[in-house]
Amino acid sequence: MQTVTVIIEYIQKHLSENITLAELAKEANYSISYICSAFRSVMNKTINNYIKEKRLDLAVQYLKADIPITEAAEQAGFNNYSYFYKTFKSVYGISPVEYRNRTLQENDER
């Protein structure tokens, strides 16, 4: 469990940066295969899926703050806009642009 805590803390501190499994393994002082297995057994998801979820959560916060979409993607740690767009749409069912428009519309209605 302590290994997973170390990994989660590292991810939180470096979310907007490129994070590799090798870096995480070095930070936790274990092999890549061990940290992947330990993380999956505790969190019921892969490290990469966890990172993706956290980056999407951060991107949503930026979109709600009316930060430009490409900048929101970049600040959330997505280095490739098309990957961000595809990932966002697959998780939320709408594009980042549609999400932003709905959020702004909801705010206007309040």
Regions found by a protein language model. Give the residues of each.
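Catalytic donor nucleotide-activated moiety binding site of glycosyltransferases and closely related
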Residues: 28
